[in-house]
A protein has these predicted regions:
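Short, structured segments at the rim of ligand-binding sites
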Residues: 1-419
Length: 419
């Protein structure tokens, strides 16, 4: 377990480079199982979730390493289709292995996936999609067993535009006979990045980024593939919010400004001035943010649920009253009570939080309940008067590569301790 000590009251000022996207890297790592040659992934973030995915790949017989932001993977000698329970139950992204394992071996076995406890996140859409492709899916003694020696293309209508289900179906359908069309598909940039990678392998994916994706089943080409992971829009949004909550001024490089439109819009509403250029962005913020009247989390291109906690932290010191509605997950306000320990004023019922901004927060001992909530605690600590201690800070490592070091380089004073 790790803890973080934040000394508040320092503005975030300077330049930072945005890392590769966690939510793009994880499904792409899974997709290397259906490559027919070595794969090199650049801008691959060094995160605990990425390390766990590499451990799963190694357990299946895949050769892989991650050094200096580049992952090297060769799945030529992969021979197992049963994922280790000890690892797969720790991270939700282990579910991404089902599609590629089915496509390559005709069989996949895993435990129910783990991850942050942020509400009910059913995997029924994943399993329903695989069944539509012809897989037999059953549960035995807490394990998910999928079998399908010959997957067949199908028309699949998703009840909800689930990112993970869309990605799993894409990977399995790439290896199936015939054409698969996914309707009501997720439109997130990470979907498009996975499609680009699959196309680079030699598969045929069209329509990614829209609500209808077509996958023409076939074989990958026998070749080496190099792919660059897209920039992480949530890391970018978190750093932008760090500048906004401290009244700072920040320049971000390696950022795709098209992917963060909804985040930038809310920070502009809070009073920040944002200018964008080719692969870069500059944000300059007032000493205290304005209220953000209403924010509702939505699937892309709406405001991302993965930025809700960070925006909540910003609203706690805003001039006026802000309202946030969490439409994606029903249990994603656990950070609210922790912010209350720091002096935040709010009421929360069901999916709606009404936040009344206070002049300043006060440092306190708080707990990170999940990845993004931990990031929100860190942001709140930056603006608070005095010192803030965040317990279970290791959860932040699931989505940020040494976030405390990045912020320290921008003027923060943060000390991390391993307990």
């Amino acid at each position: 377990m790790a803890s973080i000590l934040v000394s508040g009251g320092r503005k975030i000022v300077g330049t930072a480079r945005v890392s590769g996207a966690k939510n793009a890297a994880l499904p792409i790592l899974a997709a290397t199982l259906i490559a027919r040659g070595p794969v090199e992934l650049t801008d691959c973030p060094h995160l605990s979730d990425v390390e766990n995915m590499l451990k799963i790949l190694r357990s299946l017989g895949v050769s892989c390493s991650l050094e200096a932001g580049t992952a090297h993977i060769d799945a030529a000698k992969a021979e197992r289709c049963i994922m280790p329970q000890s690892i797969s139950k720790e991270i939700r992204s282990s579910i991404f292995m089902l599609g590629p394992l089915l496509g390559r071996f005709g069989r996949a076995v895993c435990t129910f996936p783990g991850g942050c406890e942020i509400g009910h996140r059913p995997i029924d859409l994943h399993l329903k999609g695989l069944m539509m492709l012809g897989a037999d899916v059953r549960e035995e003694r807490g394990l998910i067993i999928c079998e399908g020696r010959r997957l067949r293309g199908a028309d699949i209508h998703l009840d909800y535009p689930s990112v993970g289900a869309t990605e799993n179906i894409m990977m399995a359908a790439a290896c199936a006979d015939g054409t698969t069309t996914v309707f009501n598909a997720a439109r997130e940039p990470e979907i498009d990045d996975l499609a680009r990678f699959l196309n680079e392998l030699g598969y045929k994916i069209e329509g990614a980024g829209s609500s209808t994706i077509t996958i023409r089943g076939g074989d990958a080409e026998e070749k080496k593939t190099t792919h660059r992971i897209i920039p992480d829009r949530i890391v970018a949004g978190t750093l932008m919010t760090a500048a906004a909550i401290t009244g700072g001024e920040l320049t971000l490089t390696n950022v795709n400004t098209e992917h963060i439109g909804s985040i930038a819009a809310k920070l502009k509403e809070a009073g920040s001035v944002i200018t964008a250029g080719e692969g870069m962005l500059h944000i300059s913020s007032p000493d205290r943010p304005n209220e953000i009247r209403l924010t509702e989390t939505m699937p892309y291109p709406g405001f991302p649920t993965d930025m809700q906690a960070q925006l909540f932290a910003l609203c706690t010191i805003a001039i006026g009253t802000s309202v946030i509605v969490e439409n994606v997950f029903e249990n994603r306000y656990r950070h609210a009570a922790e912010l209350g320990r720091m002096g935040a004023s709010f009421t929360q019922k069901d999916r709606t939080a009404i936040i009344r901004g206070v002049d300043k927060l006060t440092g306190a001992r708080v707990k990170a309940w999940d990845l993004r909530g931990g990031a929100a605690m860190l942001l709140a600590g930056l603006s608070a008067e005095g010192e803030t201690i965040i317990d279970h800070a290791e959860l932040i490592d699931r989505g940020y590569d040494k976030l405390h070091e990045t912020l320290n380089a921008l003027g923060a004073q943060i000390i991390r301790k391993e307990n």
